[in-house]
Amino acid sequence: MALLQIAEPGQSSAPHEHKLAAGIDLGTTNSLVASVRSGDAKTLTDDQGRSILPSVVNYAQDTALVGYEAKAKAEQEPENTIISVKRLIGRSLKDIQARYPSLPYQFKESDNGLPILQTAQGDKNPIEVSADILKSLGKRAEETLGGELAGVVITVPAYFDDAQRAGTKDAAKLAGLHVLRLLNEPTAAAIAYGLDSGQEGVIAVYDLGGGTFDISILRLSKGVFEVLATGGDSALGGDDFDHLLADYLMEQAGLEAPLSAEKNRALLNIATATKIAFSEQDCVDVDVFGWKGAVTREQFEELIRPLVKKTLMSCRRALKDADVDAEDVLEAVMVGGSTRTLLVREMVGEFFGRTPLTSINPDEVVAIGAGIQADILAGNKPDSEMLLLDVIPLSLGIETMGGLVEKIIPRNTTIPVARAQEFTTFKDGQTAMSVHTVQGEREMVDDCRSLARFSLKGIPPMVAGAAHIRVTYQVDADGLLSVTAMEKSTGVQAEIQVKPSYGLSDDEVANMLRDSMTYAKEDMQARALAEQRVEADRVIEGLIAAMQADGDELLSDQEKQDLVKVIEALIELRNGEDADAIEQGIKDTDKASQDFASRRMDKSIRAALSGQSVNDI
């Protein structure tokens, strides 16, 4: 009897081979897919040997074309040929029309305000268009690798917001792809260069694509990538170079706006071809609808110089945020096809004081980094020494008096990371402190998830507020959290380890984030009330302790009775629900006890100076 070999989904048909995974660079202008094969990460090509797939989809009545075939239809069918859909994903129609008023597409608005593109094949939204691009890349990967993909890593610009990231994941789901992770494009480039060149030190990743610009300042050390700062512009890229040159050519040719959609697309194609030619030529001859002329690289560079300067302003801000000087940067990594523009390389080189690094194809570096990470996330490198970059999905905080949450590490912080904060004691003579670690976005402990508790003992007895306890939260690249509490004067410390993400599904994380937004106003009101109650308790306890210590000596019976009434009034307010009333009660109590506090101060000064001469002071 013949035996049929059935491969497990996500595995190749040959036994003992790794799971199949791919990294996808879903770009504004072009997209690529890469995978690790025989230990090397390489981009995967189509049947004509091309690694790049133009991010273009053409919708005919019965068929959808993707890539080069679709791009060829752009001039004849601009309304049915969707280009740079990445700019549209996650945005409302109103936002799109304000940002890109000259798009040739026929839009209509959906019930929830999202854009619908009207094509010959019917209505399409940006997620569906993106899905068609992803489907084409997924098919290429499966045909090349010879099996079903276990999952993919898709790269996104660092500045993509939640809606844009969610739209990208939805597009992948629609394309039938399992998303292992969304990865920031500059981070993907750092992964590729970190493995290939083994750099250590501060690296700047300058990523100028077709539609977006990102700058990331990274520290690379022993296989660990630490993100120091990011910046950029989600609406600036090589497409803008094309538009500026197209406007210039239109002016030189004496054409009047607006052009028809077909002519507009043709003009952009001429501008793009001219821009590419400037990488090798100083002067390019052009033919714009019968007008023949020449454009020099110097003229082109003067047009785009303000945009390149704008990117360098973002670089300057990112360096400032990272507390790093430009001369401290070891390498400037160039990513994105638009970095082939000579002026970009020259100005970036001048800014950082060194020749930019371009040893990996700038079009492919992001996809290669994504492919490397996909291979690891699929479980193909269990012993890999590379520490994966990730972000903390929910904030990590500590419980303070009154059941409040003080956030130590905010959500979306890249790991590995360490943050510290100082706290103090609440009561006189306090010798121990309970450290309660929580996870979540809400303001009150009861609304967050408890992770761990431990106690720091051996704090020297002091007056309230005198002790200094430094609490450090450290999350390593595996998501393992270490919490350390140390009393600074004695060095006594305690610590605990916990895995923050354990037991939380994506849905639970999403629900916690949703609740933090839904109850934001109520949470802030509850926090304000709790803070005032804590302050009231401090004032009440302090005043009672002072009266017990010095009341009989410094206060008359009537004064003691008056202060007792003030304390009772504050206690009543403290037990109420009005934060403003408690705040006013605290002010009234401080005012009523001011004279008593002055007498105690005088007494302390007299005691300190007792028996001393003027020469001793």
Curated annotation (Swiss-Prot):
PROSITE patterns: HSP70_1, HSP70_2. The keyword NADP does not apply. Keywords: ATP-binding, Chaperone, Nucleotide-binding. One of its GO terms (molecular function) is ATP-dependent protein folding chaperone. The keyword Chaperone applies. It holds the Pfam family HSP70. Belongs to the heat shock protein 70 family. Chaperone involved in the maturation of iron-sulfur cluster-containing proteins. Has a low intrinsic ATPase activity which is markedly stimulated by HscB. HAMAP family: HscA. This is Chaperone protein HscA homolog.
